[in-house]
Amino acid sequence: MSNTRLPAPSFRATDFQAAFGVSRETLDRLAAYEALLRKWNPAINLVARSTLDDVWERHFADSAQLFALLPEGTRVLVDLGSGAGFPGLVLAILGVPEVHLIESDGRKAAFLREVARVTGAPATVHAQRAEQAEAPPADAVSARALADLSALLPLAARFLRPGGICLFPKGRTAADELTRARDSWTMRVEEFPSRTDPSGALLRLSEIAPRGMQIG
Ligand SMILES: C[S@@+](CC[C@H](N)C(=O)[O-])C[C@H]1O[C@@H](n2cnc3c(N)ncnc32)[C@H](O)[C@@H]1O
């Protein structure tokens, strides 16, 4: 995918295509996803109504920008607290081969299954809490807007293979969350600017281990 800056405002499908260089087929799958989101949202509140007219930027582009941060050869991605599918389901549509979406709300999980069915995305939905769900060892774990880093890391550690990485988009609290998390965890931290949230940061964490334990 190319890495041009996002145009604004009124960011639409054509802008998404220009920004990420995706194929016509991928764009069509995302358009089908958007249509389902609009259809289901009034009944089950998948995303804030105020963001529905801005899905291509606030949700699709915000998720898609993580694709370029995945290590080469990433096969299995586990997305925690997927909600309406951000970022995990977008990353499956963009080409991650095996994505596991973990979402404890049964109605949201049903929506995720329907989007995966309609778009053919390689996503398996687990209608369970992340504390209980099982998935194959993950090359990468993602989560957006689920929890503070100190709560996220033990959840992510349940799924990560040795040497796996975490991708967490964070808002302006990123630095404070990192400081607190470092009390209990050692990790390599890389921070990238968010292309959709000027006050946010994309955290890529690797070499993650509880303090006092050797890295696997
Ligand atoms: C604030 S929403 C964020 C959804 C999505 N990641 C996004 O950014 O749009 C958090 C989601 O996580 C789910 N959730 C909360 N705790 C969870 C847990 N322990 N395991 C799995 N899902 C959980 C909620 O049902 C909700 O859909």
UniProtKB/Swiss-Prot annotation:
It holds the Pfam family GidB. The keyword Cell inner membrane does not apply. It is found in: Cytoplasm. CDD domains: AdoMet_MTases. It is an enzyme of class 2 (transferase). S-adenosyl-L-methionine binds at G81, F86, A130, E131, R144. GO terms for cellular component: cytosol. Its EC number is 2.1.1.170. Its main location: cytoplasm. Keywords: Cytoplasm, Methyltransferase, rRNA processing, S-adenosyl-L-methionine, Transferase. The keyword Nucleus does not apply. GO terms for molecular function: rRNA (guanine-N7-)-methyltransferase activity. It catalyses: guanosine(527) in 16S rRNA + S-adenosyl-L-methionine = N(7)-methylguanosine(527) in 16S rRNA + S-adenosyl-L-homocysteine. Belongs to the methyltransferase superfamily. RNA methyltransferase RsmG family. Specifically methylates the N7 position of guanine in position 527 of 16S rRNA. HAMAP family: 16SrRNA_methyltr_G. This is Ribosomal RNA small subunit methyltransferase G.
